[in-house]
Amino acid sequence: MASEELASKLQRRLQWEEGDSGLQPAPGAAPDPEPQPQPPAWAPTARADAELSAQLNRRLDINEGAARPRRCKVFHPYSEFPEFSRRLIKDLESMFKLYDAGRDGFIDLMELKLMMEKLGAPQTHLGLKSMIKEVDEDFDGKLSFREFLLIFHKAAAGELQEDSGLMALAKLSEIDVALEGVKGAKDFFEAKVQALSCASKFEAELKAEQDERKREEEKRKVRQAAFRELKAAFSA
């Protein structure tokens, strides 16, 4: 009986040790590498949703005037302001760069203040802000070169009030732009109408000459056909 109990205890002891050895790694064996965390399957979708949400929020801000839209369009002054000569645009560009003290491609409020003082027409703070606002297409509170040209375009078209700061800028600039209509908008547009009238007259004369040549060609063909018929009649 005692031997059976001892054998039973030994058997249980062996089973217990074998169970522990199965849980422990073998001596000298390299430990299994820890599994790397896998990114959740919804991560790309979450990023796409975040980007779309950011785009929608920016569009809402632009529509509400809280953000400025990015301008990707390339500015071509000669095509956008065809009423100005290339020389005039070059002169206006030189003037713009002269007062762009920060060399950032814009004339800000302080630079505009200095410009108007040098031109002999100083403006109040509110007056300067009003000048910028009148041509500030992108609502950034400063003048780009395109907006600077727009001042002279509006002056030539008679779209500025005579006593406005922008009209003073256009009139007092050192550049002679009278021929372009800034100081004589009426003469400018009358000259433009006259040029269009001359062009229309030239086109009318050219068309009349073309019609006359067509009629002469038709008459010549009729005469040739009649001659061939007459010749055929005599040959018969």
Curated annotation (Swiss-Prot):
Positions with a binding annotation for Ca(2+) 2: D136, D138, D140, K142, E147
Protein's recorded name: EF-hand domain-containing protein D1
InterPro entries in UniProt: EF-hand-dom_pair, EF_hand_dom, EFHD1/2
Residue ranges of every copy of the EF-hand domain listed in the record: 87-122, 123-158
Record has Magnesium as a keyword: no
GO cellular component labels: mitochondrial inner membrane
GO biological process, one term: regulation of cellular hyperosmotic salinity response
Matching Gene3D superfamilies: EF-hand (1.10.238.10)
Residues that coordinate or bind Ca(2+) 1: D100, D104, E111
Location(s) in or outside the cell: Mitochondrion inner membrane
One Pfam family, short name: EF-hand_7
